[in-house]
């Protein structure tokens, strides 16, 4: 952490950005909202979809370890950017699923998205905490609050949007568009 007169002020900005970053990273835990529409749309059963969440948690943890190692070599900015890019690619691939390939769901959401979020999670947590040597508990609590609040905030938004996109998907499949 740089020692200068702006440090007391700038650290709160970094904490705010960190909380927002963790809010978006926490969307990983909204899997239960996505599970039912995927089962309905593609005919996948509960055990197949549960396996995806198991993979997601494994690769999220591995991504955290990998993110820590990459941050030492590439720096925190590049590691967070790489994590964000991986998560974005994973979400785009997941959104483009046509139901013909369950392994593609496992790869896109379970591996790519989770690894990217793991990269960002670990690096954001450790980087922002470095700005708060006197308030590590407050800092980590605020960051983890952002991660946990994601299911409430973004999960509720996703829950509201899924019926709209699902109706569009069904209309497109039946030739209504």
Set out the residue ranges of the language-model regions.
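Hydrophobic core of transmembrane alpha-helices in multi-pass small-molecule transporters
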Residues: 104-118
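Helix-to-loop junctions at the C-terminal end of transmembrane segments
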Residues: 64-75
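Conserved small/polar residues in nucleotide/adenosyl-binding loops
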Residues: 167-174
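Glycine-rich segments within core transmembrane alpha-helices of 12-TM secondary carriers
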Residues: 137-154
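Residue-level signature of mid-helix packing/kink "hotspots" within the transmembrane helices
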Residues: 57-65, 152
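C-terminal ends and interior cores of transmembrane alpha-helices
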Residues: 86-99
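Extracytoplasmic
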Residues: 13-14, 20-36, 44
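Intracellular juxtamembrane helix-capping segments at the cytosolic ends
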Residues: 119-132
């Amino acid at each position: 952490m740089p020692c200068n007169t702006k440090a007391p002020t700038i650290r709160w900005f970094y904490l705010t950005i960190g909380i927002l970053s963790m809010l978006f990273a926490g969307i990983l835990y909204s899997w239960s909202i996505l599970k039912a529409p995927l089962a309905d749309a593609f005919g996948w059963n509960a055990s197949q979809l549960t396996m995806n969440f198991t993979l997601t948690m494994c690769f999220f943890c591995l991504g955290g370890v990998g993110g820590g190692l990459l941050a030492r070599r590439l720096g925190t900015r590049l590691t967070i950017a790489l994590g964000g890019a991986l998560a974005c690619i994973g979400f785009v691939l997941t959104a483009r699923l046509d139901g013909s390939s369950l392994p593609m769901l496992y790869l896109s959401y379970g591996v790519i998205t989770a690894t990217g979020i793991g990269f960002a999670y670990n690096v954001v947590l450790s980087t922002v905490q470095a700005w708060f040597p006197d308030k590590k508990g407050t800092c980590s609590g605020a960051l983890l609050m952002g991660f946990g609040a994601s299911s409430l905030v973004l999960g509720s938004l996703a829950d509201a949007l899924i019926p709209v996109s699902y109706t569009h998907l069904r209309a497109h499949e039946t030739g209504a568009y």
